[in-house]
Amino acid sequence: MPRRRVIGQRKILPDPKFKSELLAKFVNILMVDGKKSTAEKIVYTALDTMAEKSGKDHLAVFEEALENVRPAVEVKSRRVGGSTYQVPVEVRPVRRNALAMRWLVEAARKRGEKSMAARLAAEMLDAAENKGSAVKKREDVHRMAEANKAFAHYRW
């Protein structure tokens, strides 16, 4: 942690096909072993499949899926005295996107379809319709925060 100045966030270049920074970030999260072109191919194939099945615009379905997976609150552990409390805190906008994308990718990896593109497309379509593992994960996080609302005054 620097003492003098706050370090700014690195600017991410928008993806080449749709010119979206959010999609570029998603490709980076999906990428394994630095194979960006493979990750891009998977994402673009998944987006095409989604657009075909839903009849909507590529980015519209992607945005809708992300919106339904973004968490509003989460719990953080806070030690007070001898015990640890799960304190509900609001999630910052950048972290909301990061968590939503990470959960979508994790949920897609656990699915049973043949290719990763098919898994990703199916998970995002489910998320756009408010179902699927990624949405369930968000609901679980919200439920945890709701259950621990009594400890909200321990926020820092």
Swiss-Prot record:
Highest taxon of source: Bacteria
Keywords for this protein: Ribonucleoprotein, Ribosomal protein, RNA-binding, rRNA-binding, tRNA-binding
GO cellular component: cytosolic small ribosomal subunit; ribosome
Example of a GO MF term: rRNA binding
Biological process, per Gene Ontology: ribosomal small subunit assembly; translation
Presence of keyword Ribonucleoprotein: yes
Keyword tRNA-binding: yes
CDD domains assigned: uS7_Bacteria
UniProt-listed InterPro entries: Ribosomal_uS7 (IPR000235), Ribosomal_uS7_bac/org-type (IPR005717), Ribosomal_uS7_CS (IPR020606), Ribosomal_uS7_dom (IPR023798), Ribosomal_uS7_dom_sf (IPR036823)
Family: Belongs to the universal ribosomal protein uS7 family.
Assembly information from the UniProt record: Part of the 30S ribosomal subunit. Contacts proteins S9 and S11.
NCBIfam families to which the protein is assigned, alphabetical: rpsG_bact
Primary role: One of the primary rRNA binding proteins, it binds directly to 16S rRNA where it nucleates assembly of the head domain of the 30S subunit. Is located at the subunit interface close to the decoding center, probably blocks exit of the E-site tRNA.
Protein name per Swiss-Prot or TrEMBL: Small ribosomal subunit protein uS7
Protein source organism: Vibrio cholerae serotype O1 (strain ATCC 39315 / El Tor Inaba N16961)
